[in-house]
Regions:
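Conserved N-terminal segment of class I S-adenosyl-L-methionine
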Residues: 1-97, 101, 115-118, 189-194, ...
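A short beta-strand submotif of the Rossmann-like class I SAM-dependent methyltransferase core
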Residues: 101-107
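Short beta->alpha junction loops/turns
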Residues: 67, 107-110, 138
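Small/polar loops that bind or transfer phosphate-bearing groups
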Residues: 40, 109, 133
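S-adenosyl-L-methionine-dependent methyltransferase catalytic module, highlighting the catalytic core
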Residues: 11-17, 22, 47, 86, ...
Length: 242
């Protein structure tokens, strides 16, 4: 999973924590070819930025994090890394910059009003620029099994991370998140995840078969087999939005 630290009302130690993962490659695959300038909102220690730089060496990457310690690490891949609470006003110097793409990788579920925050950052995207989003799917098969067993407990990580303030599904994510952003038009929605093959996957099926079954399951039943929902929206001028 791609859990993030909270951006609001966190303890002082949250400002010094360091969050690392391997980046969210399936989400970054939604970037248009050769983006010139990208903003990663909730960039952590720069794992997404590292993947972007490996693929697009000339891309100028900016990031936002709540942790000064993370920012120091992330700067090795970034032109600038901003440290502030995204539920407050965007600093004037940053608000004047336009980005080909803005990334929200497992960040919006931590916010009180993620749709409003998304709309605020949408103004940093020019016409035909994009916003790409990843949020966890609360109704994946694994979560449904937990609910069926009567389990609904917050945890330090995962879908029921105790810092998650909003829950999304494949069906509801785009409808809720884009509701306050008339400038953004949905162009794609998909999931990544897996079908519960258990011992078949481990001992019997070739990896290519397992990947095929996972892909088929995610395409046909995304709300059941998807672990994360991936959304891409493109900015249009307001006078063209119906």
């Amino acid at each position: 999973m791609f859990d993030r630290a909270p951006f609001v009302h966190g303890p002082v130690e949250a400002q010094n924590r360091i969050y690392r993962n391997h980046g969210n490659a399936p989400l970054l695959a939604l970037l248009d070819d050769e983006p010139r300038k990208v903003l990663d909102v909730g960039c952590g220690a720069g794992d997404n930025a590292g993947l972007i730089k490996a693929r697009y060496p000339r891309c100028e990457i900016h990031g936002i994090t709540y942790s000064a310690a993370e920012a120091e690490i992330a700067k090795q891949w970034m032109s600038a890394c901003w440290v502030f609470d995204i539920e407050k006003e965007i600093p004037g110097q940053l608000s004047a910059v336009k980005f080909d793409a803005v990334i929200f990788s497992h960040v919006l579920e931590h916010l009180r009003d993620p749709a409003a925050i998304l709309n605020k950052f949408a103004h940093l995207v020019p016409r035909d620029g994009c916003v790409i989003i990843a949020v966890p799917n609360t109704l994946s098969w694994a979560m449904r099994w937990q609910f069926l067993r009567g389990n609904f407990e917050y945890r330090p990580d995962g879908v029921l991370d105790d810092t998650h303030l909003r829950l999304f599904t494949f069906v509801t994510a785009d409808r809720y998140l884009l509701a306050k952003s008339p400038k953004l038009k949905l162009v794609s929605k998909s999931v990544t995840g897996s079908v519960p093959l258990w011992w078949l996957r481990r001992y019997l099926l070739p990896k290519t078969w397992s990947r095929y079954i996972d892909g088929l399951g995610c395409r046909v039943w995304p709300n059941l087999f998807g672990d994360q929902v991936l959304i891409k929206a493109v900015a249009a001028s307001l006078d063209t939005v119906s």
